[in-house]
C-alpha cells in the first residue's frame, strides 16, 4: 500500500497543469484623456485564432490560447482610461444616430483574429503569432478605418525544456500588449482627425 501511495504522489507531481498559464487582460494603460461623449462598440464575434502546428516537439499538443475575453476586456479598460465620458453599445449606430445622440464619435472594434505557426527548424522550435483587429472611428460625416496587427515570435531549443504552451503565452501576451498600444494610438489619432 505504501508503494501505491508513493507511486501516485510521484505521478501527480510529474503531471503538468497547462490551464494555469493564460493570456491576461491589459490593465496598465498610459492614455491621454479625450474630451466629449463617445460611443464604443465592441463586436461580440468570437476571436478567431488559427493554429498551424507542423511539429509535435515542445509539447505542442498542449497549446491552448484564448484571446477572446482578454482582448475585449483590454478594450474596455482602455476606454476607461481614455474617455471622460463614453457608452458601450450592443450595436453600431448609424451616422444619423451618432449625431442625434450627441456623440463626438463612435469607435467600433471588430474583426478580431489571429494566426499562430509552430515548426521545428533543425533543433529549434519556432513559434510566431499575429493578432489583428479592425478599428473604425466615425462621426456623422467622416470615418476612418484602420486594420491593426501585432506580430511576435518565440524560439527554444527542443532538447532544453521546450514547452510551446509557455512560449505561446509569453509571445501571445507580448503581442496583445503591442496590439493594444497600437489600438490606442490609432484610436486617439483617428478621433483627432475626424473632430478637428
Where are these regions (language model features)?
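Solvent-exposed, acidic/flexible segments
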Residues: 64, 68, 72, 126, ...
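A structural "domain/chain start" motif
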Residues: 13-78, 192-196
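Surface-exposed short loop/turn segments
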Residues: 16-20, 91-149, 156-160
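Short secondary-structure junctions
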Residues: 82-92
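Short acidic, glycine/proline-rich loop/turn micro-motifs
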Residues: 52-58, 117-120, 160-164
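Generic solvent-exposed, charged/amphipathic alpha-helical segments
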Residues: 72, 76-80, 84, 184, ...
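Sec-dependent N-terminal signal peptides
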Residues: 3-12
Amino acid at each position: 500500500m505504501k508503494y501505491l501511495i508513493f507511486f501516485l504522489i510521484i505521478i501527480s507531481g510529474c503531471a503538468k497543469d497547462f490551464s494555469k498559464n493564460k493570456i491576461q487582460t491589459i490593465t496598465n494603460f498610459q492614455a491621454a484623456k479625450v474630451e466629449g461623449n463617445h460611443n464604443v462598440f465592441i463586436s461580440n464575434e468570437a476571436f478567431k485564432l488559427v493554429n498551424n502546428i507542423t511539429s509535435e516537439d515542445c509539447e505542442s499538443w498542449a497549446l491552448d490560447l484564448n484571446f477572446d475575453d482578454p482582448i475585449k476586456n483590454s478594450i474596455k479598460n482602455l476606454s476607461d482610461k481614455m474617455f471622460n465620458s463614453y457608452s458601450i453599445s450592443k450595436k453600431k449606430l448609424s451616422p444619423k444616430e451618432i449625431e442625434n445622440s450627441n456623440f463626438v464619435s463612435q469607435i467600433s472594434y471588430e474583426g478580431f483574429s489571429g494566426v499562430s505557426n509552430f515548426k521545428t527548424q533543425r533543433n529549434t522550435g519556432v513559434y510566431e503569432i499575429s493578432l489583428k483587429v479592425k478599428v473604425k472611428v466615425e462621426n456623422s460625416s467622416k470615418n476612418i478605418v484602420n486594420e491593426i496587427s501585432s506580430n511576435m515570435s518565440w524560439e527554444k531549443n527542443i532538447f532544453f525544456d521546450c514547452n510551446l504552451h509557455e512560449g505561446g503565452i509569453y509571445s501571445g501576451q507580448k503581442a496583445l500588449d503591442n496590439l493594444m498600444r497600437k489600438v490606442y494610438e490609432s484610436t486617439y489619432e483617428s478621433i483627432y482627425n475626424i473632430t478637428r
